[in-house]
């Protein structure tokens, strides 16, 4: 594997008008609500969704109240791939995206005629922050012979510079296909996900050195100790996690794939190495099973995130209601950038649709998704 001689930081100084950094994000997380306030806000939001001909599209990592509200109102709670498809195909006039900014941008790119709102436009992503378009363009220009594959967790401008966009649920399959065709790849921005895919496919990948603030904090040593404490538990790991964590996994997969594994595996106890927001959906999908948060640090240490994204935490019932009431926090993407960015997104969606048809025809969806057999071995 080749790797870029480059170091990037997710909490770098931000340009004027850029989304907020880690500390400011935590400061902007809305206060918790008492039950009466929560119920009143949910009722208000339901009425506003109808009034505005809007649908709520939420990620698995946002607050459980938002996920429940999306389910109750005919919206969507999903990973970034399904969020993109759902928003594109839904007939709502307005898409309200509860997640981080790149998700809102992707929704706008795929649905240019729809209004796209977000509870807080400052909600960003460490991977997005760590891959600024000017530096990334220079990096790509230095290697013009390579196919540029970017993760969904990037800005619209970075996507516009790419040949392919991928999510964690389809990235391995797309890179394997490109490798089979003899293509050399630039991968950005997550080095852990890229390294996992490279080891699985053998592809020639030149890596951008970004990482997720949440997943980068999981500790292999501490996870191994927890595994011995709960020897009957299966370990579920998102591939944005460090190699030492992935090596201990029983299942490595996207958020949707990890939820599927929690439902379908016979185990009654799971250790989960991804953002703790996913536990809401896991508990609903697999009632009676026990889910334990994977450790982000030792008992005497501190962590940056404690397994929760500060920018995801900025999404709340209070600012969702405010956005619907006032019609602000609308996402806009420059037309030329949106047009270029749509190509790699559509390529991914088309590939995913064809891949799903092939797998369904073979009758072997579980094995093809690598959910259950030796997936932790890299």
UniProtKB/Swiss-Prot annotation:
Location, primary (coarse class): cytoplasm
Keyword Coiled coil: no
Keywords: 4Fe-4S, Cytoplasm, Iron, Iron-sulfur, Metal-binding, Pyridine nucleotide biosynthesis, Transferase
Transmembrane segments: none
Reactions the enzyme catalyzes: iminosuccinate + dihydroxyacetone phosphate = quinolinate + phosphate + 2 H2O + H(+)
Binding of iminosuccinate, residues: 59, 80, 151-153, 168, 238-240, 255
Pathway(s) of this molecule: Cofactor biosynthesis; NAD(+) biosynthesis; quinolinate from iminoaspartate: step 1/1
Cofactor annotation: [4Fe-4S] cluster
Signal peptide: none
Entry's Gene Ontology molecular function annotations: 4 iron, 4 sulfur cluster binding; metal ion binding; quinolinate synthetase A activity
Gene Ontology BP annotations: 'de novo' NAD biosynthetic process from L-aspartate
InterPro entries xref list: NadA (IPR003473), NadA_sf (IPR036094), Quinolinate_synth_A_type1 (IPR023513)
Binding site for [4Fe-4S] cluster: 125, 212, 309
Localization (cell): Cytoplasm
UniProt xrefs under Pfam families: NadA
Cofactor note: Binds 1 [4Fe-4S] cluster per subunit.
Gene Ontology CC: one annotated term: cytosol
Catalytic activity, EC: 2.5.1.72
Similarity field: Belongs to the quinolinate synthase family. Type 1 subfamily.
Primary role: Catalyzes the condensation of iminoaspartate with dihydroxyacetone phosphate to form quinolinate.
Protein name: Quinolinate synthase
Species the sequence originates in: Burkholderia pseudomallei (strain 668)
Gene: nadA
């Amino acid at each position: 594997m080749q790797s870029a001689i480059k170091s990037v930081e997710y909490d770098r100084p931000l340009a004027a008008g850029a989304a907020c950094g880690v500390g400011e994000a935590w400061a902007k997380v809305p206060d918790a609500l008492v039950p009466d306030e929560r119920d009143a806000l949910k009722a208000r939001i339901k009425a506003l969704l109808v009034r505005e001909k809007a649908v709520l599209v939420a990620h698995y990592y946002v607050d459980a109240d938002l996920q429940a509200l999306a389910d109750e109102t005919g919206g969507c709670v999903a990973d970034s791939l399904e969020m993109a498809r759902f928003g594109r195909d839904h007939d709502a006039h307005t898409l309200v995206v509860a997640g981080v900014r790149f998700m809102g941008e992707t929704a706008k790119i795929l649905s240019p005629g729809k209004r796209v709102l977000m509870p807080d436009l400052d909600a960003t992503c460490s991977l997005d922050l760590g891959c600024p378009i000017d530096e990334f363009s220079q990096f790509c220009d230095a290697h013009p012979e390579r196919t540029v594959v970017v993760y969904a967790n990037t800005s619209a401008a970075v996507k516009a510079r790419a040949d392919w966009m991928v999510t964690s649920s389809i990235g391995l399959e797309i890179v394997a296909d490109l490798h089979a065709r003899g293509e050399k790849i630039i991968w950005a921005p997550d080095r852990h996900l890229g390294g996992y895919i490279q080891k699985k496919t053998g592809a020639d990948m030149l890596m951008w050195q970004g990482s997720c603030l949440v997943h980068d904090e999981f500790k292999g040593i501490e996870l191994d100790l927890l595994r011995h404490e709960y020897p009957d538990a299966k370990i579920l790991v998102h591939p944005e996690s460090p190699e030492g964590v992935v090596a201990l996994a029983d299942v490595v997969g996207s958020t949707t794939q990890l939820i599927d594994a929690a439902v379908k595996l016979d185990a009654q106890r799971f250790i989960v190495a991804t953002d703790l927001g996913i536990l809401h959906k896991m508990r609903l999908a697999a009632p009676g099973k026990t889910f334990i948060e994977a450790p982000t640090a030792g008992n005497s240490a501190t962590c940056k995130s404690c397994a929760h994204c500060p920018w995801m935490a900025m999404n709340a019932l209070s600012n969702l209601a405010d956005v619907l009431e006032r019609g602000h926090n609308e996402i806009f993407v420059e037309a030329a950038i949106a047009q270029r960015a749509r190509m790699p997104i559509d390529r991914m969606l088309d590939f995913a649709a064809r891949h799903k048809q092939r797998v369904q025809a073979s009758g072997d969806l579980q094995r093809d998704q690598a959910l259950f057999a030796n997936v932790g071995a890299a």
